[in-house]
């Protein structure tokens, strides 16, 4: 084995997560505004020691998966099987063409994995060939019989809680999985157990107490509260945009194509509502304005759809570990009338940003026939955005 083994990772995300309650598969639910699976995958996708990340998903979840992990770098997902064991084997077979030295197998529901834990996994597998992260048992454990009566009290000094990523030499764990499948064994709950069954010695290395598996509604409630408490740096920004009317038969407003007697004079699609929101978000980040990120002199933005700009602004918040808490936009115009479109506009902004519609407000007013909007020469919009960033991002104490 070389000092720098060629390492790949499998992210197991084909389960349904029924114990987590309503809301769909748990790996696609959000924590502090970010999908669990994105939190679980990103440390592998960005780790310098991991050359490839292979997701294994349920084919029914393709749309959710693509939306949740947009922007990350990974191999095309493969479909999972009826059991976790079958899903892992599908991931291993998909990686066989790469012939990695080491493979890390990680559950998507463990979304607090750290780069340090990944590095320890790679080192352990390189040294022993098969290893898993563990943490000590701190509670007293009781073994009970079928009636629920205590049958024994094991010595917790020798007990450990298994975690992922579990790490193996690729060739040996692929062989073990193939042998188990051909032997009709499909009841293993983790990959270390398959390695043990195949006669391999499995070593352990230091896990991480925070590397918990999201399983129950209580897990989600607790971790949501913890993460939101850490996002205590609350910031606000405001934005303003205006566009004059020109020739055309429609205008774009808050992501909707609205029939109108005139169009906008604009370099992009001229959506004043979304442009104002972009400026508000960038202002909250102290990150310039829409013109500095998307110069009107740049031909690539000619006729561009403004939802791209808004998604970009949201990504800037996410990249700093934050989330958007509230968005508000006020349209200033005589026509078209905004009232009948208000709910559809709110829904469209929510779709673009991933912000719950209950945190998106669209309002409208006129200038009482005064000024350019009163003369129906164009439309203006103002916006505000409230975001939450982690304490310490700019050297401030929490």
Swiss-Prot record:
Disulfide bonds: none
Cofactor or coenzyme needed: a divalent metal cation
Pathway involvement of the protein, from the record: Isoprenoid biosynthesis; isopentenyl diphosphate biosynthesis via DXP pathway; isopentenyl diphosphate from 1-deoxy-D-xylulose 5-phosphate: step 2/6; Isoprenoid biosynthesis; isopentenyl diphosphate biosynthesis via DXP pathway; isopentenyl diphosphate from 1-deoxy-D-xylulose 5-phosphate: step 4/6
Annotated site location: Transition state stabilizer: 19, 26, 267, 366
Binding positions for 4-CDP-2-C-methyl-D-erythritol 2-phosphate per the UniProt entry: 241-243, 267-268, 289-291, 365-368, 372, 375
Chain intervals for the UniProt region annotation (2-C-methyl-D-erythritol 4-phosphate cytidylyltransferase): 1-234
UniProt site (Positions MEP for the nucleophilic attack): 156, 213
Keywords for this protein: Isoprene biosynthesis, Lyase, Metal-binding, Multifunctional enzyme, Nucleotidyltransferase, Transferase
Chain intervals for the UniProt region annotation (2-C-methyl-D-erythritol 2,4-cyclodiphosphate synthase): 235-398
EC number(s) recorded for this UniProt protein: 2.7.7.60, 4.6.1.12
Catalytic activity reported: 2-C-methyl-D-erythritol 4-phosphate + CTP + H(+) = 4-CDP-2-C-methyl-D-erythritol + diphosphate; 4-CDP-2-C-methyl-D-erythritol 2-phosphate = 2-C-methyl-D-erythritol 2,4-cyclic diphosphate + CMP
Any GO MF annotation of the entry: 2-C-methyl-D-erythritol 2,4-cyclodiphosphate synthase activity
Residues involved in a divalent metal cation binding: 241, 243, 275
Signal peptide limits: none
Pfam name, any one: YgbB
GO process annotations (BP): isopentenyl diphosphate biosynthetic process, methylerythritol 4-phosphate pathway; terpenoid biosynthetic process
Top-rank lineage group of the source organism: Bacteria
Family statement: In the N-terminal section; belongs to the IspD/TarI cytidylyltransferase family. IspD subfamily. In the C-terminal section; belongs to the IspF family.
Its job: Bifunctional enzyme that catalyzes the formation of 4-diphosphocytidyl-2-C-methyl-D-erythritol from CTP and 2-C-methyl-D-erythritol 4-phosphate (MEP) (IspD), and catalyzes the conversion of 4-diphosphocytidyl-2-C-methyl-D-erythritol 2-phosphate (CDP-ME2P) to 2-C-methyl-D-erythritol 2,4-cyclodiphosphate (ME-CPP) with a corresponding release of cytidine 5-monophosphate (CMP) (IspF).
Full protein name: Bifunctional enzyme IspD/IspF
Protein species of origin: Rhodopseudomonas palustris (strain TIE-1)
């Amino acid at each position: 084995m070389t000092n720098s083994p060629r390492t790949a990772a499998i992210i197991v995300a084909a389960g349904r997560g029924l114990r987590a309650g309503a809301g769909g598969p748990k790996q696609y639910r959000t924590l502090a505004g970010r999908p669990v699976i994105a939190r679980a995958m990103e440390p592998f996708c960005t780790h310098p020691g991991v050359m490839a990340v292979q997701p294994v998903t349920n084919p029914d979840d393709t749309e959710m998966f693509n939306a949740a992990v947009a922007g990350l770098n990974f191999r095309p997902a493969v479909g999972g099987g009826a059991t976790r064991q079958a899903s892992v084997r599908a991931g291993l077979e998909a990686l066989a063409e790469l012939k990695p030295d080491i493979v890390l197998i990680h559950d998507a529901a463990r979304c607090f994995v750290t780069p340090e834990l990944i590095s320890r996994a790679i080192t352990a597998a390189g040294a022993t060939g098969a290893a898993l992260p563990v943490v000590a048992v701190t509670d007293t454990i009781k073994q009970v019989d079928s009636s629920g009566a205590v049958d024994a009290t094991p010595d917790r000094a020798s007990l450990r809680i298994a975690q992922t990523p579990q790490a193996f030499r690729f060739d040996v764990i692929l062989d073990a999985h193939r042998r188990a499948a051909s032997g009709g064994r499909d009841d293993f709950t983790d990959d270390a157990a398959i390695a043990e069954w195949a006669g391999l010695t499995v070593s352990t290395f230091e896990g991480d107490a925070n590397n918990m598996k999201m399983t129950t509604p209580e897990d989600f409630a607790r971790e949501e509260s913890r993460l939101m408490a850490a996002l205590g740096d609350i910031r606000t920004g405001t934005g303003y945009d205006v566009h004059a009317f020109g020739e055309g038969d429609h205008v774009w407003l808050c992501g909707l194509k609205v029939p109108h007697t005139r169009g906008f004079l604009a370099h992009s699609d001229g959506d004043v509502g979304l442009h104002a929101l972009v400026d508000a978000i960038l202002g909250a980040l102290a990150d310039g304005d829409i013109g500095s990120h998307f110069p009107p002199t740049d031909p690539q933005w000619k006729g561009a759809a403004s939802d791209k700009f808004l998604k970009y602004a949201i990504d800037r918040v996410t990249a700093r570990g934050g989330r958007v808490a509230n968005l508000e936009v006020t349209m200033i115009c005589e026509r078209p009338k905004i009232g009948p479109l208000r709910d559809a506009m709110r829904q469209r902004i929510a779709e673009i940003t991933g912000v719950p519609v209950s945190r998106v407000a669209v309002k409208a007013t006129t200038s009482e026939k005064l000024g350019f909007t009163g003369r129906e020469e164009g439309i203006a919009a103002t916006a505000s955005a409230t975001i939450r960033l982690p304490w310490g991002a700019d050297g401030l104490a929490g």
